[in-house]
């Protein structure tokens, strides 16, 4: 029973982290589409702040034993690749 609860908490933690990563991607996409260009200091500040916050969330979940360190790094790497692709698409417009 306890192991089932732990697995459930791990799944929920990873799902919440993925939701936060998706929110960051959407926030940056809206910002690029409507507000600022990637070279703008505001864009860079928002991106840096959001990525730092997510990395701290992941670190916290890893320290609690809810998320594997490799899985957390994978999530950050995936988000960075998606943001890079979004940036490339925007600059090619």
Curated annotation (Swiss-Prot):
Pfam families the record matches: DUF1507
Tree of life domain: Bacteria
The protein's name in its UniProt record: UPF0358 protein BPUM_1375
Protein family membership: Belongs to the UPF0358 family.
Cited SUPFAM superfamilies: EF2458-like (SSF140404)
């Amino acid at each position: 029973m306890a192991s089932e609860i732990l697995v459930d908490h791990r799944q929920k933690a990873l799902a919440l982290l993925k939701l936060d990563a998706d929110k960051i991607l959407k926030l940056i996409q809206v910002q690029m589409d409507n507000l600022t260009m990637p070279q703008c200091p505001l864009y860079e500040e928002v991106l840096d702040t959001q990525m730092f916050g997510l990395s701290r969330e992941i670190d916290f979940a890893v320290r609690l034993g809810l998320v594997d360190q490799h899985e957390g790094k994978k999530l950050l790497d995936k988000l960075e690749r998606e943001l890079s692709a979004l940036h490339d698409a925007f600059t090619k417009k």
